[in-house]
Amino acid sequence: MENAFKSHLQFTEKAIKKIKNLIEIEKNHDLKLRIYINGGGCSGFQYQFIFDTSINEDDIIITQSEVSLIIDPISLQYLYGGQIDYLENLEGSKFIVSNPNAKNTCGCGSSFSI
């Protein structure tokens, strides 16, 4: 299923630029960013990001500005209405999620609770 959920999870321009840059470095234009939720972290759930070429039967593909995100339906429920950004500062660089469904987040921003 592609783009039916586009308005439910968005990329910022910085995230789009970084994803395109990483795909260029890998020289594999079939790569898509997969985001999924795992149990763990100090708040109960963790965001996980990987580049992937495999698409499972129930995966949802969201494309924005020629960048595709793969997400499973269960993870999308936790991220509904969210935004993926990319942050670079003195502490390092990472993809971050602005999640309106999270009741609490940890200090590092990589885990949350609902």
Curated annotation (Swiss-Prot):
Q: Tell me the residue numbers annotated for binding iron-sulfur cluster.
A: 42, 106, 108
Q: Which UniProt keywords apply?
A: Iron, Iron-sulfur, Metal-binding
**Which Gene Ontology BP terms does the record give?**
iron-sulfur cluster assembly
Keyword Transferase on entry: no
This one is known as Iron-sulfur cluster insertion protein ErpA
Q: Tell me, in a sentence or two, what this protein's role is.
A: Required for insertion of 4Fe-4S clusters for at least IspG.
InterPro entries linked to this entry: FeS_biogenesis, FeS_cluster_insertion, FeS_cluster_insertion_CS, FeS_cluster_insertion_RrpA, HesB-like_dom_sf
- HAMAP family, per database record: Fe_S_insert_ErpA
Q: How is the cofactor bound?
A: Binds 1 iron-sulfur cluster per subunit.
An example Gene Ontology CC term for this record: cytosol
Q: Where is the signal peptide?
A: none
What protein family does this chain belong to? Belongs to the HesB/IscA family.
Q: Which GO terms describe its molecular function?
A: 2 iron, 2 sulfur cluster binding; 4 iron, 4 sulfur cluster binding; iron ion binding
Self-association and partners: Homodimer.
